[in-house]
């Protein structure tokens, strides 16, 4: 009898939850339509995986890629609409948020074909991999549109949990387990510090959680210059710093990059930074509006440390993935310049433009690492010597992406950095821009060192890995080349025609 009563209560509670979810989607679903497409894709993947005895892998890739492309299409159709706040103030839709959501979707769309051959060669479980990628993408999209402290905390945790699972996906690899453990422990600690900062904001504003209402609450309580806000600012900076991984919050980055599966590293290296940058701009610009001088100083210190340490330590690396890890630390220092400048001197527009180019440059480089690693089983920089003699397309595309990362003209990376540094100079950040220029020259050195190895034709320098190099006969080989081709084109051609990209980026300001 008791069991029947408990069962009936469970059914009633489940029905109420489903009805409430249906009510929310019915009245607010149009505001999160791109996210709903991804949710539908996730449900479809789960249904096919649970009902199909014989797994047809191409269908899983097709469903995942189609849902991402449809979500991008929905975002483009919604472009230029009036800003809307929905879900009782928890979520905001505007051009600024949507451009970051577009960047996250673009990263995921390029990462799936980049992963096909790797999954087939390593015999990884495909369904779980795609589910984690789509769920992480969903968490990043919700973070970009988050308008209150609870959503800003829950959304990145959704992204982070999937990131932990993805980084430890090759469970038999000791390095992968070590990377996951470090990532999980440091991620949990940073989340605790972040929520501690949010609690100070919540208390100081008189119990407000919406970003704009926090500002009004601080004015009403006269707490905007209190020590509590300083504690909140420091704690929030530390929490967001872990997601962005600038120095000195970069300790997890090299180990996670080296130990995780390469397609996972490619995905995390760009999506985490895009989502965290979107969140950082809103958190620093709105709740900490009265502490702008303080957070500008904190971010300037982080940017200087990141640009110097990231680029100097990258010179000494022998692993390609660890080199890109330290390179990404230096790159985030450049992005922070745009956050500091803000919307007064096109700082956000320059940051968005550079991040768009960084996605193509970084993913193009990782596509080459995936392709070379599957054929040779090595990640050592020295083992790339003479690759041009065996695979000219792979060597040339790698060289273009690396040159663009270094910021050499007339590639996209040069114009992205030029616009970013020009906006910083116009805003009076002379010292910061000077450091950026000097460290960019340093980065060109270690990128050119790799390109020299790729292009060498001396027999005595060509390693056994390249001598025994064979192109893969797998049909999925074209998927990596497709991703690489798209990234190479995006790393070169936009540098010639910058005006349309700048116009779109400038329209995103909120």
From Swiss-Prot:
Keywords: Chloroplast, Membrane, NAD, NADP, Plastid, Plastoquinone, Quinone, Thylakoid, Translocase, Transmembrane, Transmembrane helix, Transport
Catalytic activity as recorded in UniProt: a plastoquinone + NADH + (n+1) H(+)(in) = a plastoquinol + NAD(+) + n H(+)(out); a plastoquinone + NADPH + (n+1) H(+)(in) = a plastoquinol + NADP(+) + n H(+)(out)
GO cellular component: chloroplast thylakoid membrane
InterPro entries in the cross-refs: NADH-Q_OxRdtase_suN/2 (IPR010096), ND/Mrp_TM (IPR001750), Ndh2_N (IPR045693)
Statement: the UniProt record of this protein carries the keyword Plastid: yes
Membrane topology reported for the UniProt record: Multi-pass membrane protein
GO MF assignments: NADH dehydrogenase (ubiquinone) activity; quinone binding
Superkingdom of the organism of origin: Eukaryota
UniProt-listed GO biological process terms: ATP synthesis coupled electron transport; photosynthesis, light reaction
Transmembrane segments: 24-44, 59-79, 99-119, 124-144, 149-169, 183-203, 295-315, 323-343, 347-367, 395-415, 418-438
EC numbers: 7.1.1.-
Group of enzyme by EC: translocase
Localization in the cell: Plastid, Chloroplast thylakoid membrane
Physiological role: NDH shuttles electrons from NAD(P)H:plastoquinone, via FMN and iron-sulfur (Fe-S) centers, to quinones in the photosynthetic chain and possibly in a chloroplast respiratory chain. The immediate electron acceptor for the enzyme in this species is believed to be plastoquinone. Couples the redox reaction to proton translocation, and thus conserves the redox energy in a proton gradient.
Subunit structure: NDH is composed of at least 16 different subunits, 5 of which are encoded in the nucleus.
NCBIfam families: NDH_I_N, PRK02504.1
Family: Belongs to the complex I subunit 2 family.
Listed name of the protein: NAD(P)H-quinone oxidoreductase subunit 2, chloroplastic
């Amino acid at each position: 009898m008791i069991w029947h009563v408990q069962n009936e209560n469970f059914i009633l509670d489940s029905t109420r939850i489903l009805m409430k979810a249906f009510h929310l989607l019915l009245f607010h679903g149009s505001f999160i339509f791109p996210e709903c497409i991804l949710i539908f894709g996730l449900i479809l993947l789960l249904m096919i995986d649970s009902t199909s005895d014989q797994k047809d892998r191409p269908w899983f890739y097709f469903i995942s890629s189609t849902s991402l492309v449809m979500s991008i299409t929905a975002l483009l159709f919604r472009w230029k609409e009036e800003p809307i706040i929905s879900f009782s103030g928890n979520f905001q839709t505007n051009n600024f948020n949507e451009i970051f959501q577009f960047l996250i979707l673009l990263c995921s769309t390029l990462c799936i074909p980049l992963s096909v051959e790797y999954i087939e060669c390593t015999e990884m479980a495909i369904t779980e991999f795609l589910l984690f990628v789509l769920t992480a993408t969903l968490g990043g999209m919700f973070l970009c549109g988050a308008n209150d402290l609870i959503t800003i905390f829950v959304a990145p945790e959704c992204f982070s949990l999937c990131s932990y699972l993805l980084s430890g996906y090759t469970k038999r690899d000791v390095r992968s387990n070590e990377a996951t453990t470090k990532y999980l422990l440091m991620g949990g600690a940073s989340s605790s510090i972040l929520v501690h900062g949010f609690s100070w904001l919540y208390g100081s504003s008189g119990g407000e959680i919406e970003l704009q209402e926090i500002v009004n609450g601080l004015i009403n309580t006269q707490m905007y210059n209190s020590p509590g806000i300083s504690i909140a600012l420091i704690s929030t900076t530390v929490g967001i710093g872990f997601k962005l991984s600038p120095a000195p919050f970069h300790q997890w980055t090299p180990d996670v990059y080296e130990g995780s599966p390469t397609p996972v590293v490619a995905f995390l290296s760009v999506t985490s930074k895009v989502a965290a940058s979107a969140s950082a701009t809103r958190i620093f610009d709105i709740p900490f509006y009265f502490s702008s001088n303080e957070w500008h100083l904190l971010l300037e210190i982080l940017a200087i440390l990141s640009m110097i340490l990231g680029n100097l330590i990258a010179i000494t690396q022998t692993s390609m993935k660890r080199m890109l890890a330290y390179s990404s630390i230096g790159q985030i220092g450049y992005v922070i310049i745009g956050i500091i400048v803000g919307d007064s001197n096109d700082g956000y527009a320059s940051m968005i433009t550079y991040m768009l180019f960084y996605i193509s440059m970084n993913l193009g480089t990782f596509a080459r690492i995936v392709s070379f690693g599957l054929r040779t089983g090595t990640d050592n920089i020295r083992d790339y010597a003479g690759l041009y003699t065996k695979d000219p397309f792979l060597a040339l595309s790698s060289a273009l992406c690396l040159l663009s990362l270094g910021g050499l003209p007339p590639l996209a990376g040069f114009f992205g950095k030029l616009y970013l540094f020009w906006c910083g100079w116009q805003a009076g950040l002379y010292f910061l821009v000077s450091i950026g220029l000097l460290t960019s020259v340093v980065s060109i050195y270690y990128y050119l060192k790799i390109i020299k190895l790729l292009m060498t034709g001396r027999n005595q320098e060509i390693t056994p890995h390249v001598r025994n190099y064979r192109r893969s006969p797998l049909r999925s080989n074209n998927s990596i080349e497709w991703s690489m081709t798209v990234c190479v084109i995006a790393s070169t051609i936009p540098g010639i025609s910058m005006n349309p990209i700048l116009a779109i980026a400038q329209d995103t300001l909120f």
